UniProtKB/Swiss-Prot annotation:
Cellular compartment(s): Cell projection, Cilium membrane
Chief localization: membrane
Membrane topology (Extracellular): 1-11, 64-92, 153-201, 276-284
Gene null: resulting phenotype: Defective response to diacetyl with wild-type response exhibited to other ketones and odorants sensed by AWA.
Gene that specifies this protein: odr-10
Lineage, top ranks: Eukaryota, Metazoa, Ecdysozoa, Nematoda, Chromadorea
Descriptive protein name: Serpentine receptor class r-10
Length: 339
């Protein structure tokens, strides 16, 4: 499809995504406050992810990213809403990359918590204060790695300046060069028929893949171990087992959503230039997916956790008594969850 059509789709997804993200996450935060009293420290993880999702959606709305793959180069281009320096634009793009990486890392932490709750309950103390505060510090390491390589290993050069100008002129001719900032992932170039590989850029991509792979391995291992343990142990109450299964189903779906909307598109984003696959403006399907992701992910929790779902349904139907009953049921159920 043409660049103009893709920009229309991306901008529409931006509006839909930020609206959905705000509505769903505010509802989830309200449910956590009124129905999550006895959910333990897990409610803090869900609350953090909700707040982060809102923040991520705001960043995307401000930066208005577009993506383009052409001539062994992947371009992350941000359309400026107001004028600022090239250096600040580079920092903004790297910060967007940090938010992108955070979504992977936090998903992994969710699975670690459920793994501890089901398989290693004695380790749940690591999610209590004050050690709970160490988790953001640990998560910041891979996030900082991702953002740092995006900023330092992909400098603007004469080639990238000419390349991004050519991309804008050929595919997005209504966007002026001075109104964008960008990061160009150049894998290699051909000069006089000889291929010159950019080792720094390939190293940066390796770091990105390492972070993605590690978070995916953590989710897969913890998810499998949790499922196996739940099926082996029959000595827990029906209420506890039911709630554990609801939370596990939510996490499984919360793995599928980022896999479809984040992992798979990002994998294509980094692999296509290496094999000289010119997706051109079609690479914007990655942005399209990323705009919708922050609103879809927390929606899973609301739909899967029965008491959350019933509370919303009863509220919409005006059944106050049922809502109060749901609150009591929620407290009874969640009191069974390890904290």
């Amino acid at each position: 499809m043409s660049g103009e059509l893709w920009i229309t789709l991306v901008d529409t997804a931006d509006i839909v995504g930020v609206t959905l993200t705000f509505c769903v996450n505010i509802v989830l935060l309200g449910l956590l406050k009124t129905r999550g009293k006895n959910l333990g420290t897990y409610k803090y993880l869900m609350a953090f992810f909700s707040v982060f999702s809102i923040f991520y959606a705001i960043i995307e709305f401000i930066l208005r990213p577009i993506m383009h793959i052409e001539n062994t180069t992947f371009f992350l281009i941000s359309r400026k809403r107001f004028n600022y320096s090239t250096k600040l634009g580079k920092i903004n793009s790297a910060f967007y990359c940090a938010c992108f990486a955070t979504s992977f890392v936090v998903s992994g932490v969710h699975f670690v918590y459920r793994y501890f709750a089901t398989c290693k309950p004695n380790l749940l103390r690591l999610f209590n204060l004050p050690t709970l505060l160490l988790w953001p510090l640990g998560c910041s390491v891979p996030v900082t790695m991702w953002a740092s390589v995006s900023y330092f290993l992909y400098p603007d050069t004469e080639y990238t300046e000419a390349a991004v100008t050519n991309v804008l002129n050929n595919h997005y001719n209504w966007i002026k060069k001075e109104n964008v900032s960008y990061i160009a992932y150049v894998y290699y170039q051909y000069e006089n028929g000889v291929r010159h590989i950019y080792l720094k850029n390939l190293l940066g991509c390796f770091v990105h893949y390492f972070v993605m792979s590690m978070t995916f391995v953590v989710m897969f291992y913890c998810g499998y171990a949790t499922w196996k343990t739940m099926n082996e142990h029959k000595d827990v109450s029906d209420r506890t087992r039911a709630l554990q299964k609801q939370l596990f189903k939510a996490l499984v779906l919360q793995t599928l959503i980022p896999t479809i909307f984040m992992y798979a598109p990002t994998g294509v984003m980094f692999i296509a230039p290496f094999f000289d696959v010119n997706l051109n403006a079609n690479a914007n399907f990655i942005v399209f997916c990323s705009f919708l992701y922050p609103g879809l992910d927390p929606l899973i929790l609301i739909l899967i956790i029965r008491d959350f779902r019933r509370t919303i349904f009863n509220f919409l139907c005006g059944k106050k008594n049922s809502v109060d009953e749901s609150r009591s049921t929620t407290r009874a159920n969640l009191s069974q969850v390890p904290t």
